[in-house]
Structure formats: C-alpha cells, structure tokens
Amino acid sequence: MPETKPDSSSVRSLPAAAASRSMVDSFGRRIEYLRISVTDKCNLRCVYCMPVEGLPWLKRDEILDYEEIARVVRVMAKMGLRRLRITGGEPLVRRDLSSLIRMLSAIDGIENIALSTNAVLLEDQAEELKAAGVDRVNISLDSLRADRADTIARRPGTLDKVLRGLAAAEAVGFEPIKINVVLMRDSNDDEIADFAAITRERPWHIRFIEIMPTGSNTDLSADSFISCNEALERVRELGDLKPVQGPLGNGPATYYRFDGAPGTIGVITPMSHNFCDRCNRMRLTADGQLRPCLFGSIQTDLRSALRQGEDIRPLVEETLRIKPERHWLVQGSTEGSGGLIALSQTGG
C-alpha cells in the first residue's frame, strides 16, 4: 500500500528509520492514527452523545495519567503510529492538558496532533495549546441559532461560547479549522444551507456527520437520521459542488467545494456508506482500553499492564490482529454492535 506523503506545512520532521515502520492489520490497512480520550467528562449534554443526567464518571484512579498515555504513544510510535487526536468527553475539562500535549509532541515519530473540542473552554486555552504542540482543531457546532444550540447541548449560552472559542482558534493560527455538524432531521437539517454558505466566506471545513446509534441515543438516531447524500442534495441547490482531490486530514470525510470558495464541505457517512475499508485508526479510552473499532465490544486492557510494568507491545499487536474488517451496524438496528456505549466514553 503506498504511503501518503504528509503535508509539510503541518507535519513535524520524521527520521527515515521511523518512516519505514508501519502497523498493518489483518486486512492490509495501515494503522497510523490513534484517538486518545483523556476524560469521560463533558461540560455539555448533547442529545446524541449523553443522557441529560450524565453518566457514572470514572474514578480518578481509573483514568490513565499523562505519563501512562505517553508510554502508550511511545510504544505505538515505534510500531508506526504517526498521528494523534485528543478527545474526551470534552478534553479541555481535564486539568493542564497542555502538559500532555508537550509530552506527546516530543515523541519521536509523531507527526501531527489534533484536538476535538466543543470549544466552550477554548477561548482561554487556545494560545497555550498551540504553543504546546496542537496542530489543528475540530470544533463541534450543531446549530447557528442560539436557542437551538442550547437545546441540542442542553446548556445555556452554548453558541456564544463556541463562537468565541472559534475566534480564538483563528487568532492563534490553528489551520485548518474543521467544524463538525451532526445531522438530525427536524432538529437542525433546515440549517444545512446556512452551514454550507459559510465556506464561501471562511476557509473552514464544514463537515456533516450522520448520527450514529450509540449509548442511550438509539431511538433518537432512528427517528432523526438524515443521510449525507440528502444533505449534499440540499447544498447543491446553492450552486455547483466539485470534489476536492487529495486528503484533507486523517479521517474518513469526503470533501467538496463551491467554485472559488475558500472553505470546503465534507461528509462523514458511517451509516449510509461505511468507510471501514480505509479505516486507519484505533482508540485509547480514558481508562486505558485500546479499542480497534468504535462499535462493538472488542477492547484490550492496557492500563493493568502499564501499572504492572509489563511490555504493552504484544497487547497492541494482538489488538491490531483482531481489528474487525468492518462494523455491522445498520441504521435503526443495534444488531452486531456488541453493546454500544456513549460517544463520550470512547472519544467518538
């Protein structure tokens, strides 16, 4: 499988010896991307992610400390890991996150560190995170209307805080900025055109994401599902869209652009057109479970091995070996899921 040449503008220098290493699963997919959940806690209660009453939080001693996370990344970087994404819950609620970023950015072989956030706390942390080594940010924003944003997030004042976080991200030079919009019929689908129009004015990547049945949201997912194909049909009413050639990141989005627009429109289709054949990632949960797939029950306990001083490389290799070919979710059904848990508990 040919290796994609990274964008030199956002990738740290990589020694030749490190560049030759790679992790390849049983289906020939190169795994070079790890999503790291640093906390299961969140300061919002988004309807598609977490029940209104919250969830039982992990105890402090159940969560990996920063040195334990760095140990996992050091081992996996020697095996071919190249890119990291810091997630939660909401990662910015974890104290002194920038110290972890500094540790991870110093690890040989790591090319890029991204952050997924709801941006509520980003205004005060953007500059420090940029200096520590975060290269880019993805920001969740499901409505451009203040009352509706509050309804979806179940917290007051959400939109204003997110927009201030966005402004701070731009001011410190995060590029590109990606905005994730979870599509929900009869909730925010009437804003599809409004979000798309932003790309004609701003160099942002607006990404429409199909809602997935996870945790307690299976009924919502079934009732609210709208495909990205339908979203694109609505966007095309604004003008012609052209596919964007080449990768614009580490993930599964397919991108389009209006003629002359500085920004792009992306679609992420886990339900209508799964992208498992090009999956390049694994997930490390806040409590130290290495998950080869977002869906399903397969996970490997790295925390116990770390705390007993054991070599975790064999565990990583075994998890890589048993990574499934695809998830088996069908819209409106949880059959084959192996027991879904909330996105806040897996890092999405």
Model-derived features: positions:
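Radical SAM enzyme core and accessory elements
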Residues: 1-24, 273-348
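Radical SAM/AdoMet-radical enzyme domain recognition
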Residues: 63-86, 93-209
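Secreted/processed peptides and extracellular or luminal domains of membrane proteins
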Residues: 48, 52-55, 228, 282-285
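Short capping micro-motif at the N-terminus of alpha-helices
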Residues: 265-267, 292-293
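Radical SAM enzyme [4Fe-4S]-AdoMet core and its adjacent flexible, acidic
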Residues: 3-7, 14-16, 142, 147, ...
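Short glycine/proline- and charge-enriched loop/turn segments
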Residues: 52-57, 147, 215, 299
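Conserved alpha-helical substructure of the radical SAM core
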Residues: 2-111
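Glycine-centered loop/turn positions within well-structured domains
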Residues: 44, 146-147, 274, 300
